[in-house]
Amino acid sequence: MQNIPQMLEITRAVVDAVKIPVTVKTRLGWDANNKIIVELAEQLQDCGIAALTIHGRTRAQMYTGEADWTLIGEVKNNPRMHIPIIGNGDVTTPQRCKECFDRYGVDAVMIGRASFGRPWIFKEMKHYLETGE
């Protein structure tokens, strides 16, 4: 995330080289002073990616602090964006999963560390999304 031109060049090259959909997973930015995801999302879409997954923390944060879904929602609600936006970060309960869909409008959520030792979390979330229970 410190060399965006190179990132975009590589992304374009991969999209052009393969016959399958290319997706990207990235973070909000490098650090709190460089949250560039709104602009970067548009640039990645222009490279021809099929979907974008956004982790709600910066690279500097790693896994500390809370994921900031505000910018994920901003990307999703950008009228220029037409690819699926997948949110990631701190989706640890079925209720939080539903909130991410309802509040931020994402097309999907990606579950990461919350599934470690809890592989049944996916079934729980699916059930909650379908029934509210």
PLM feature segments, named:
Residues 1-133:
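Flavin-dependent oxidoreductase catalytic cores
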